[in-house]
Amino acid sequence: MKKIAVLLAEGFEEGEALFVVDVLRRAGFQCNLVSINEEMVKGSHGIRVLVDKIISDEIKEYDMIVLPGGLPGATNLRDDERVIELVKYFDK
C-alpha cells in the first residue's frame, strides 16, 4: 500500500489538506497528517486538527508528500529546514 504524508503547519488551508486526506483514504492509500511542530495544528479558519505524526526522518519511507496551501501555513512550511530537506529528497 502506498504511504502518503500530508504536512501541516499552523495556518494551513483546511479544505486543501483535509479533502486530500479524505479522497486518498477512500481510495485505499495510507495517508497520515504530519505536523512540523505540535500534535494539534490550527488551520487558517481556526479549525484545530489532531495529526497522526510529528515530522521526522521516518517520512522519507513514504511514497509521497503533500504540502497544502493557506497562509501562514504555506509560509511556515517553506521556512522549515526539515520540510525543505524532504522536498529535495522527494524531488529525486
Placement of each model-derived feature along the sequence:
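Extended, subdomain-level signal for the structured scaffold at the beginning of enzyme domains
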Residues: M1-D91
